[in-house]
């Protein structure tokens, strides 16, 4: 019986090395143009698709957040009162600019092998702004203390208070609840004071 070839992506060591180097240089969420450029470059080292690049960055960010959360939980358990921190506001779409921006690390990677790329002039002009923006975004997750940002509710028991919020098991919300919640959401909303957030008017 002939075996069908696996469709799963198996990155080569060169592909992994390049992706990790780009991640360390600040590329966290490449846009579509960057993903195309990265994919084209990595194709020299083996089979790869754009979705592989996209998912690699998503997974790498998720693993980094998990590691950070574990470290913060361990630190929280060692010292009972961690310093509180403020979370900076997320950048808006207007701050990012309307022009498609290419991360300097992607341009450096691309420029290294392809000297006459049409995006090179536009990306070089915007690289300084984008580099600052990526650097800020890279610093934000480290500034967030996941163990101290979640506050316990007044109805929390003493046992719940002993476990830091980041270390408690996650609660799964039912997508389609089988029990009615005190008469239903619409009744609760509209029986309370008539506020603009509860209005059910149609446009």
Swiss-Prot record:
Q: Which Pfam family name is an example for this entry?
A: Homeodomain
* SMART domains for this protein: HOX (SM00389)
One term under GO cellular component: nucleus
Name the residue ranges with Low complexity bias: 119-135, 190-203
**InterPro entries the record matches:** HD, Homeodomain-like_sf, WUSCHEL-like
Lineage, top-rank taxon, reads Eukaryota
Recorded GO molecular functions are:
DNA binding; DNA-binding transcription factor activity
Summed up, the tissue specificity of this protein is: Expressed in leaf primordia, young leaves, floret meristems, floral organ primordia (except carpel primordium), stamens and carpels. Does not show polar expression pattern.
Q: What is its main location?
A: nucleus
Among the GO biological process terms of this entry, one is: plant organ development
Q: Which UniProt keywords apply?
A: Developmental protein, DNA-binding, Homeobox, Nucleus, Transcription, Transcription regulation
The answer to keyword Transcription regulation applying to this record is: yes
Q: What subcellular compartments does it reside in?
A: Nucleus
Question: Which PANTHER family does this one have?
Answer: WUSCHEL-RELATED HOMEOBOX 1-RELATED, WUSCHEL-RELATED HOMEOBOX 3
Task of the protein? Transcription factor which may be involved in developmental processes. Seems to act as repressor of YAB5.
Name of protein: WUSCHEL-related homeobox 3
């Amino acid at each position: 019986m002939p075996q069908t070839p696996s469709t799963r992506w198996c990155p080569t060591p060169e592909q992994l090395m390049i992706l990790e180097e780009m991640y360390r240089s600040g590329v966290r969420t490449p846009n579509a143009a960057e993903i195309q450029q990265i994919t084209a470059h990595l194709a020299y080292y083996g089979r790869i698709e754009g979705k592989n690049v996209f998912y690699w960055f998503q997974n790498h960010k998720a693993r980094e957040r998990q590691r950070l959360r574990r470290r913060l939980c361990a630190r929280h358990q060692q010292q009972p009162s961690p310093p509180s921190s403020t979370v900076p506001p997320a950048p808006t779409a207007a701050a990012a600019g309307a022009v498609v921006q290419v991360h300097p690390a992607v341009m450096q990677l691309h420029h290294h092998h392809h000297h006459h790329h049409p995006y090179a002039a536009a990306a070089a002009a915007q690289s300084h702004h984008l580099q600052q923006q990526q650097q800020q975004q890279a610093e934000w997750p480290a500034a967030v203390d996941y163990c101290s940002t979640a506050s316990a509710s007044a109805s929390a028991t003493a046992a719940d208070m002993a476990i830091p919020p980041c270390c408690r098991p996650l609660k799964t919300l039912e997508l389609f609840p089988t029990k009615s919640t005190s008469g239903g959401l619409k009744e609760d909303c509209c029986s309370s004071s008539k506020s603009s957030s509860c209005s059910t008017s149609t446009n």
